[in-house]
Design a protein with these regions (language model features):
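Early extracytoplasmic/lumenal segment of secretory-pathway proteins
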Residues: 1-13
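Short, hydrophobic alpha-helical packing/hinge segments within bilobed ligand-binding/sensory domains
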Residues: 9-12, 127-128, 146
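Hinge/capping helix and adjacent helix->loop/strand transition within the periplasmic-binding protein
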Residues: 14-24, 37-126, 175-177, 188-189
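Alpha-to-beta junction loops
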Residues: 18-27, 88-90, 114, 132-141, ...
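Beta->alpha turn/N-cap motifs
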Residues: 26-32, 66, 124, 141-146, ...
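C-terminal lobe and pocket-closing loops
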Residues: 58, 77, 146-189
């Protein structure tokens, strides 16, 4: 069962309601840690209400722009993006309020000295569509959410937030290659 919504709040509430059912398991994201803190009305205590079993994998994050966006046309590198971002009028689409997306934006603001408006969406697919639809100018997202738009040439990846390039995106430099080793992030699944 897929329970999208509320930065994982819907799934957390559903699984908590299944307490004692040994046939219910949840695969989640980093929002497992942040959502209960930001949505206290859910009444969830991750230490008392859940039993972690394993981390299945980690998913990388990338900086994505619309290839020919009104404010992003002509941006080809992370440095191009940062120069444009310092004008202070870009909009970033992300998944949920106070989610890892918004926290990553805060990290980038501090690292690079720019400001951007954050607009929360209901999920990663909606974030990707919002970028291509021109509702936002950039996003920090995992490859799977943007893959279709990337393959069609509608979106462009500027950097992989990892030490090394990803073989699936050989033309996208890593943050380490560009001299930004602190720009590293993995989403747990």
């Amino acid at each position: 069962i897929n329970k999208p919504g509320g930065s994982g709040g819907e799934a957390l509430t559903y699984v908590k309601g299944k307490s004692g059912d040994q046939h219910t398991i949840m695969i989640t994201l980093n929002s497992f840690f942040t959502t209960p803190q930001n949505q206290t009305e859910l009444g969830i205590n991750i230490l008392d209400d859940y039993t972690p079993l394993a981390r299945l994998l980690t998913d990388t994050f990338m900086v994505w722009i619309k290839k020919d966006g009104a404010k992003t046309s002509g941006i080809n590198t992370l440095d191009d993006f940062l120069a444009r971002a310092k004008q202070g009028d870009l909009v970033m689409g992300g998944t949920g309020k106070m989610s890892e997306d918004e926290l990553l934006l805060g990290m980038m603001r501090g690292m690079f000295g720019f400001d951007a408006k954050y607009v929360p969406y209901s999920g990663g697919g909606a974030v990707a569509k919002g970028l291509i639809g021109g509702e936002s100018d950039f996003t920090l997202n995992n490859p799977s959410e943007q893959m279709g738009f990337y393959q069609s040439g509608d979106s462009k990846a500027l950097v992989m937030m990892t030490p090394k390039r990803n073989p699936a995106f050989p033309e996208v430099p890593s943050s380490y290659e560009l001299g930004y080793p602190d720009l590293e992030y993995y989403m747990m699944r």
